[in-house]
């Protein structure tokens, strides 16, 4: 439901990290979660060994998220074991039934299902996932890209919509519009990739700092730590 207020607590996930030194630096700024894209054709792709290297150096309070698309259970198990991530973000065409299988197979993994919003029909699918996943992530639709487009979807589609589980907003969020995005849509968290980059996979730490400053988040005051099952 739309209103003009900012929630008292908001999670911030920075996604599309590829450089260990940047991931460690951003984790120390007070973000809630870091996302690592494992889809090979993505310009933000990062290998499992690099993800594992990063995860070993992060505090457990920072949720580590592997972003995947249409992997089978065996591949997911190998990824979780190899990297040590705390969460899986299913960003492909995974069905509610498949998400249930993932939940049963990985009961201790935080499970996020991304939906790429093309129309109100996309949002109608949310209830089918809500009882299985820990978070829904609503992202902008693009016919060739799974995310990181830098474009928002039509936020007015969320007007008066009841989402029956915690959810995060993605797509076209920047340090400049983050407060507007949160006030207008009222998510529990926001997810940024291109909005804080100098180029795909390389973050602009100054823009990350500006984002967190605009939201009143710092290294000693992470408003919504996500690094445990919720």
Swiss-Prot record:
InterPro entries: Aldolase_TIM, PRAI_dom, RibuloseP-bd_barrel, TrpF_fam
Keywords per UniProt: Amino-acid biosynthesis, Aromatic amino acid biosynthesis, Isomerase, Tryptophan biosynthesis
Pathway of action: Amino-acid biosynthesis; L-tryptophan biosynthesis; L-tryptophan from chorismate: step 3/5
Top-level class of the enzyme under EC nomenclature: isomerase
Transmembrane segments: none
GO biological process: L-tryptophan biosynthetic process
One Pfam match: PRAI
Known EC number: 5.3.1.24
UniProt xrefs under Gene3D superfamilies: Aldolase class I
Catalyzed reactions per annotation: N-(5-phospho-beta-D-ribosyl)anthranilate = 1-(2-carboxyphenylamino)-1-deoxy-D-ribulose 5-phosphate
PANTHER family: N-(5'-PHOSPHORIBOSYL)ANTHRANILATE ISOMERASE
HAMAP family per record: PRAI
Entry similarity comment: Belongs to the TrpF family.
Official protein name in the record: N-(5'-phosphoribosyl)anthranilate isomerase
